[in-house]
Amino acid sequence: MQEYPIIDADAHVVEAVAGIRKFLKEEYQARPIWTNHSWDMDFGGTLGKHNDKPEVQLADMDAEGINTQVIFPSRGLSLNFEKQTQLAVNVARAYNDWLAEFCSVNPQRLKGVALVALQDVDAAIKEARRAVEELGHAAIMLPTNVKDQDIGRREFWPFYEEVERLGVALALHDGTRMAERMHGRFETFISVHTVAFPFECMTALTGLMFAGVPEVFPGLRFAALEAGCGWVPYLVDRMDEEFAKRGSREAPLLKLKPSDYFHRGQFYITFELEERMLPYVIERLGADKLLFSSDYPHWDTEWPNAVKAFLSREDVSQADKRLILCDNPQRFYGFSADCKSV
């Protein structure tokens, strides 16, 4: 019997279009839900497992040995790139309703992450409140940019204020369409996928930090997901260096060094299972900042061997493995998991 519950801090569901459509307002019923497309559409055998049924999700969690899974969208990852604002607002609401229905099959094990359309900040505030207080979602997904705008901008601060009041985590997750500038530069998906997620997370965290968001809203918790972890010590060092030289003029709201906001527990990160930089990141930032992610059911997941692959690593201590698999995600997301759920 496993000694502690294993929590997957970043998994996905492939949205059921028909299921979401039934929650849309009538004027959107006949329209395409996802007007953005993504790369990697024609590579046979690389698209992962398309699952939109909670019973299958739970069975696959059992196969992996996962007690609780925090569930993000797939197509919806790029919602905040949608140019039709009202469509994005309505799709976010419908998706959250559908996801609540999906998770209701076993709410102890299936934890939904709500979508909001930050193209309309007032609507995003209302939807965040509804998603948490009425639907019971565990966190809110934060895009790395909103139509290529810095998410640290003051126009988004009322949203951060409301999320801090709600007491839930903000999970920073990129989608391949969010890094639009990469698509004009590269001709292959492999190039975009290699750099888009870490570079977008670096950009987003830099914007949040120097805008003063972690200082102004000290109750907020952020996680940078699915972007690896090796770049984080570099970024933290570089932000500290820049802050020492220019912070008083260009980041006057920060009362601490950027690294201090990481060390005090406002920022968490996931890692790639085979990432060789992981021990160094643990040494520099601490194992208490790391979260385990299977990325199920996407094409690059290690399912059903993700947990086994991590537990087999000899360069991470047993105590740190427990932190990463169990204690950290409960602290970040603010829920309790139970071994008995499997």
Question: Which stretches of residues belong to each language-model region?
Answer:
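Helix-coil boundary/capping segments in enzymes
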Residues: M1-V342
